[in-house]
């Protein structure tokens, strides 16, 4: 998500999104961190209701403030594509600890879908770190996987967490069936 450096292979598995898609259904989203949504008929705003059971890997609850922090961090310190893609978002606000509202400058249905796919970062972890700088520290995530081990430029191993908060959600049935996944790097990118 940051501008400098290349993200580690498998790092996209470290963070859950507000909602998740199905690999066999086009444009269908299912609740994950957000257990419910509400949106205007003209597609100019959307409210995500955060599942009160949603937790980061340190056991702290995922809140609307984390979503606001994530969006603002991506817009100010993330890759330039975020600014371009989300330029139609007028503002984002936490209505309470479990409701977050995105208001758009104009109607844009596909942007509502994209916002639902937003990975959520833990504010309490990232607010004291420089998000724009590459790191070799294992980040705190929200998904069912964390980095188990790595060797820079050679491999990354992610491991499944047994106490993942969303392991029993219907959307996760049949997913996350491997205890470990290893990503190897090769000097030749064509390999």
Question: Can you annotate each of these PLM segments?
Answer:
Residues 43, 87, 97, 140, ...:
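Short helix-initiation/N-cap motifs at beta->coil->alpha
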Residues 1-9, 33, 60, 82, ...:
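A structural "hinge/loop" feature
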Residues 1-41, 72, 140:
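N-terminal lobe/hinge region of extracytoplasmic solute-binding protein
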Residues 35-80, 95, 101:
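Aromatic- and charge-enriched surface segment that lines or borders ligand/interaction sites
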Residues 22-24, 116-175, 180-182, 190:
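Gly/Pro-rich hinge or "lid" segments in bacterial periplasmic/extracellular proteins
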Residues 83-126, 146-151:
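Surface-exposed binding/hinge segments that line
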Residues 1, 35, 45-48, 67-70, ...:
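Short, well-ordered beta-strand elements
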Residues 19-23, 42, 55, 67, ...:
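Sec-exported extracytoplasmic/periplasmic mature domains
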């Amino acid at each position: 998500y940051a501008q400098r450096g290349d993200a580690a292979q498998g790092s996209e598995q470290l963070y859950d999104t507000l909602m998740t898609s199905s690999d066999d259904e086009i444009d269908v989203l299912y609740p994950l961190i957000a257990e419910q949504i509400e949106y205007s008929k003209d597609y100019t705003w959307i409210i995500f209701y955060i599942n009160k059971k949603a937790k980061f890997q340190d056991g702290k609850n995922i809140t609307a403030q984390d979503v606001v922090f994530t969006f603002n961090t991506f817009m100010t310190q993330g890759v330039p594509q975020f600014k371009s893609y989300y330029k139609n978002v007028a503002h984002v606000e936490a209505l309470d600890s479990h409701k977050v509202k995105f208001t758009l400058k104009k109607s844009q249905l596909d942007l509502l879908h994209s916002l639902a796919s937003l990975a959520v970062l833990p504010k309490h972890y990232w607010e004291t770190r420089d998000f724009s700088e590459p790191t070799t520290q294992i980040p705190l995530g929200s998904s069912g996987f964390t980095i188990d081990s790595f060797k820079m430029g050679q491999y990354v191993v992610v491991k499944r967490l047994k106490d993942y908060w969303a392991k029993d959600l219907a959307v996760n049935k049949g997913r996350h069936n491997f205890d470990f996944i290893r990503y190897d790097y090769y000097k030749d990118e064509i390999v």
